[in-house]
Regions:
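Well-ordered alpha-helical scaffold segments within catalytic/enzyme domains
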Residues: 1, 72-87, 137-145
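Low-complexity, Ser/Thr/Pro/Gly-enriched N-terminal "stalk/linker" regions
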Residues: 1-66, 96, 100-117
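Solvent-exposed loop and edge beta-strand segments that line ligand/cofactor-binding
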Residues: 55-74, 122-134
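Alpha-helical packing segments of well-folded alpha/beta enzyme cores
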Residues: 13, 17, 70-73, 77, ...
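Soluble or luminal CAZymes and related metallo-dependent hydrolases
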Residues: 9, 93, 130, 134-137
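Active-site-adjacent structural elements in enzyme catalytic domains
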Residues: 79-80, 84, 88-126, 140
Length: 145
């Protein structure tokens, strides 16, 4: 069955990605290995600095720079998947992604701000910059959910 083979490949990619790039503490996917995300102390100092030595307001290269964008995209995809499969596993994955997006939007206490990501170490440190792609995908994923 072609669908079964495709599902198996998708599940392998999910599990492999989750093992390296996902933190169950924050329910977010990172763009670096979770173990390589800067410490809360480095985040507070806006490190790593940009290549030109300037302050890194958005956390570029930190692994936290696109968590909300990725989370929204993943959540929307999980909602599509749930519409077809109606399975408990997809429902649980979607709920986890929703929790991560809500964390990024609330952990800092700044109403209306969506952080790009949250430290997987202390589950609260963030970089102060965001962008429209973080908002767009995060809100779209939450809307689909």
């Amino acid at each position: 069955n072609d669908n079964a083979a495709l599902e198996a490949k998708i599940e392998k990619i999910w599990q492999d990605s989750k093992a390296v790039f996902y933190s169950p503490k924050t329910d977010l996917f990172y763009t670096r290995k979770v173990v390589d995300v800067p410490s809360p102390e480095d985040i507070a100092q806006l490190k790593p600095l940009k290549k030109n030595g300037k302050i890194n307001w958005h956390g570029g290269g930190s692994g936290t720079e696109d968590c909300s964008m990725l989370g929204g995209i993943i959540l929307a995809g999980l909602c599509d998947r749930y519409e077809v499969l109606k399975d408990d596993e997809t429902k649980a994955r979607a709920a986890a992604m929703c929790r991560g997006l809500i964390l990024a939007a609330t952990v800092h206490g700044d109403r209306g701000f969506i952080a790009r990501g949250v430290s997987p170490e202390d589950c609260k440190s963030i970089y102060p910059g965001s962008s429209r792609d973080q908002y767009t995908h995060s809100i779209h994923g939450l809307w689909r959910y």
